Amino acid sequence: MTVPLPDLMQEYRCRCRADSDIREYLPLLHGYACLYPGVRVLEVGVRSGNSTVAFLAAAQAMGGHVWSVDIDSDCFNRPWHGHPAWTFTCGDSTHPAVTGKQPHQVDVLFLDGDHGRQKVLDELAAYFPRVQPGGVALLHDTRIRWPGEPPGTWPVTRALDEFCEQQGLHWAELPGAYGLGVIVREW
């Protein structure tokens, strides 16, 4: 017996109304993905699936696909598991066995996994080169502290500053309780 897949747009709208740390950015995530016909989204960090649903609803509308990575195998139990527009890889986002399974070209890169400075730098090094010209990298939680990081610092912000300085790039921070960093890959 096949379990029916959820109505992704309805699920997305419900999650936009539900309390979560990403709620204020869900319309933006969805909107960015809707900019690209045949959108290719690479998401690191699924957790409860709020961002995943925003991207999947856009991918369904745009004829695209979402690849998600998370270390938590419980992500296999999401209602949209089996959706033809979703590929999930369970594992460490920077392990070669995981990075090798991800698409080589993406329009939207979303990082919201481990928020330690070094891990974010490693994810940017592994995945930002896959962002196509005109594409975007979005990094959630630019305004949170992380265990093991120096007091008074925001590790995602520090990683963005370091990566962009090394690469000759610029990033912007969108306001909000948790912060969202944006890097646009120039043409």
Residue ranges and their predicted role:
Residues M1-F110, D114-W187:
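A short alpha-helical cap/connector motif
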